[in-house]
Design a protein with these regions (language model features):
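Short glycine-enriched, charge-decorated loop/helix-capping segments at active-site entrances
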Residues: 66, 133-134, 234-242, 343, ...
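Active-site-proximal loop/helix segment associated with metal-binding centers of metalloenzymes
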Residues: 157, 173-194
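Conserved N-terminal phosphate-binding loop of PLP-dependent enzymes in the Aspartate aminotransferase
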Residues: 297-703
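A short helix->loop->beta-strand "cap" motif at the edges of active sites that frequently abuts
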Residues: 165, 262, 510-513
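Active-site glycine-rich loop that binds ribose-phosphate moieties when present
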Residues: 136-177, 199-203, 444-448
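Active-site flanking residues adjacent to catalytic metal/cofactor-binding acidic residues
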Residues: 17, 96, 121-123, 170, ...
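Catalytic cores of soluble, metal-dependent hydrolases
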Residues: 4-92, 103-104, 110-113, 189-296, ...
Length: 703
């Protein structure tokens, strides 16, 4: 085995080398970049990925004339890098200006006994020589120096010249013609932003990695943060517009440091003084963390080994979401027709909601309800105005809001209705899903949800869903409340008979029983009305909201009722440390405004009609579908369990770039973000039609 093979086969530990130098830059702004990134937690970010990381050393720029001082700095850096590689570490060099690359990559080559391939990610070519440079700043010269041309202070560092055939430059958009001619004459491959925009970064990165890692040989990565667009990374020495996005670059370099052939990583040109909000530092750390991240299969294995086995996810590891689209760790895009069980009704990373989250997070996040905050009253005011209820009690998850409603109902039963203490009954329906706490599980009819978790609280009853007569028969003088979903989502998108909720409302009113609607999934426009109960023109005594209320960013939920119900709560009766916090209140209030401003309720009704019409067309063309059910953008495809199963079909849709989820193995849930366009919805429906057509062709033919 060669020395190179031995080196690259070692299990790496990352060793940080900070370089406090701006000797090659026009200003000293980047001198403190390495130390600033250290304070921002760059070591911890790497440890989060499961790799070992430690700070090796910090190198200070020596005093003296500029070029001799730079030469001394480069020699010291090259020696440190060489020692790190030789001992099996992966050096992560943090600058400082890009001139330090002339030391980093000579050091790697010296350790290898041969030149590494080099992936150079930069807005600029940095391929000037002293004769061609307009500014004569050394940070514009390191790539030429590494190819053996330039000032002796930068070229006469121990280690081999780079092989131009194994150098690839990505992200370039600002350079002088002399630089491009210099690199072209030597055969260095340059991938500019125009090509990246035309072909996509993933395709360009694949070509670049094939160049730098040709013949299975070792390589490294030099990242000048100015490769990023200034909107993401303003804190750089020489910003240049129309650059790379952080998320797309993170995906493109994902896991590269775990590649046994990647021997070193370098990040340069970070200027803390120009990064008041810390955007650039976070971008740099995010990119390095992405390069250290395990691959999708490894991440699934880690979760399986370290997490509880209470979920069986579809085999995809998602890493980014924008609007109605999600991307996995490999950059594959998927249309989201699940929207996290309606939690992402406003789409992923809605710009207004993200801006509100970021702004509020820098002001005030959590104080507990021991004090007032300036955001909660405004949220409560808007929420009650919009829904028409007098009061709202904010908590976090849907489960908490359901528990809050049950507590309110029981105390109302005891203190207002006059039910004997500890005798207040709650009625729910078979097939319900209200959460998974002990009390709520006691209301469930699903055997798996109940198995092994008893005993459950007393005075909990269940009746058939959709049967108003069964409700009337179940009510006793001790009944405090009837808890019902307007549409049973987890139960299979089950819609009750027309007039059912109205009949239940009349029965409850006649017997002085609270009607509480669980609208955690159906509320806030999902079904084409603000509340799903409005389809039956009823106003429940209490409504439970959640999921979409947090804008897809935070867990926010609430129980809404009028004073006659909410009066039962006195200080100390109920609470939640995070419930009603300023951050959640700000985001939820903005989510309500987005709902109104973008007319998402009306949009859900219109697109929902299209969705259901197309699903019925698909069903008519296949024996695999037994029924189509839904309202608004909330639909279910029930399949014939004798012919197929919903999980298999969901996996087939995943393979075609569509994310859905089965429920109980027989129903495929369709609930896209309310922001989905007609074109996006049609694209997803076409994939659904194709999957059912393919599955139908595989059915055995009758004899």
């Amino acid at each position: 085995m060669s020395a190179t093979s031995k080196l690259v086969a070692l299990n790496p530990m990352l060793r940080f080398i900070g370089v406090a130098s701006a000797l090659g830059a026009p200003s000293p702004d980047c001198r403190d970049g390495a130390e600033s990134l250290r304070r921002m937690g760059i070591e911890a970010a790497i440890r989060r990925t499961g790799l070992d990381a430690g700070w090796g050393t910090s190198i200070e720029a020596p005093d003296g004339p500029r070029l001799p001082a730079l030469a001394a700095l480069l020699r010291e850096l090259a020696a440190e890098v060489r020692g790190s590689v030789a001992t099996g570490h992966v050096p992560v060099v943090l600058g400082g200006d890009h001139a330090i690359a002339a030391g980093t990559w000579r050091g790697v080559g010296a350790a290898l006994g041969g030149a590494p391939g080099l992936l150079w990610i930069d807005a600029h070519l940095d391929a000037h020589t002293p004769d061609s440079s307009p500014s004569h700043n050394a940070h514009g010269m390191p790539l030429a120096a590494l190819l053996g041309v330039g000032a002796p202070e930068m070229t006469r560092i121990a280690g081999p010249d780079l092989d131009p055939a194994r150098v690839a430059v990505i992200g370039v958009r600002s350079y002088e013609a002399e630089e491009m001619r210099f690199l072209a004459a030597r055969g260095v491959q340059v991938f500019g932003m125009a090509e990246i925009l035309r072909r996509g970064l993933a395709a360009v990165m694949a070509d670049a990695l094939a160049i730098v890692g040709a013949d299975d040989s070792p390589f490294g990565i030099s990242l000048d943060i100015d490769a990023l667009d200034p909107q993401f990374a303003p804190g750089v020495t020489t910003p240049s517009d129309n650059g790379l996005g952080v998320a797309e670059l993170a995906t493109a370099i994902g896991g590269l440091i775990r590649n046994r052939r990647c021997l070193a990583f370098e990040i340069v040109e970070y200027c803390p003084s120009r990064d008041a909000l810390g955007l650039t530092a976070r971008a740099a750390i995010e990119l390095l963390e992405a390069a250290c991240r395990p691959g999708g299969e490894a991440l699934q294995c880690i979760e399986a080994a370290r997490g509880a086995s209470n979920y069986a996810p579809l085999p995809v590891v998602l890493s980014e979401g924008r609007g109605c689209w999600l991307s996995d760790v490999n950059g594959q895009r998927y249309l989201d027709l699940m929207s996290a069980y309606s939690a992402v009704s406003f789409g992923h990373a809605h710009p207004r909601l993200v801006a509100t989250l970021a702004s509020q997070a820098t002001r005030l996040a959590v104080t507990s309800r021991a004090y007032f905050n300036d955001r909660l009253p405004l949220f409560l005011n808007r929420l009650t105005d919009l829904t028409g209820y007098e009061r709202a009690l904010p908590v976090n998850t849907g489960l908490e809001a359901v528990e809050t409603a049950l507590k309110a109902a029981r105390k109302w039963g005891h203190k207002v209705k006059g039910i004997a203490e500890d005798c207040a009954e709650i009625i729910a329906c078979n097939g319900n899903f209200h959460g998974r706490s002990i009390a709520i599980t006691g209301l469930s009819s699903e055997p798996q949800y109940r198995d092994g978790f008893g005993p459950f609280p007393p005075a909990l009853k269940r009746i058939p869903y959709g049967d108003a007569a069964a409700l009337e028969a179940a009510i006793t003088p001790n009944t405090a409340a009837f808890l019902v979903e307007p549409i049973q989502g987890e139960g299979g998108i089950i819609i009750p008979p027309e007039g059912y909720l109205a009949a239940c409302a009349e029965i409850c009113k006649r017997h002085n029983v609270l009607l509480i609607a669980d609208e955690v999934q159906t509320g806030l426009g999902r079904t084409g009305h603000l509340l799903a109960t409005q389809h039956d023109r009823i106003r429940p005594d209490g409504v439970i909201l959640g999921k979409a209320l947090g804008g897809g960013l935070l867990p926010v939920s609430a129980f809404l009722a009028d004073e006659r119900v909410m009066q039962v709560f006195k200080p100390g009766d109920h609470g939640s440390t995070f419930g009603g916090n300023a951050l959640s209140a700000a985001v939820a209030a903005e989510a309500l405004e987005v709902l109104v401003d973008e007319r998402l309720v009306e949009r859900s009704a219109a697109l929902g009609a299209m969705l259901l019409a197309r699903l019925h067309e698909i069903a008519a063309a296949t024996p695999l579908i037994r029924a189509i059910r839904g309202r608004g953008l909330f639909a279910g495809i029930e399949v014939d369990a004798a012919l197929t199963d919903a999980r298999t079909l969901a996996e087939a849709l995943l393979a075609r770039g569509v994310l859905t989820k089965d429920t109980h193995g027989t129903v495929i849930r369709i609930a896209p973000p309310l922001t989905i366009s007609e074109e996006e919805l049609e694209w997803g429906l076409q994939r659904i039609a194709e999957v059912f057509a393919d599955a139908g062709r595989r059915l055995p033919r009758a004899a």
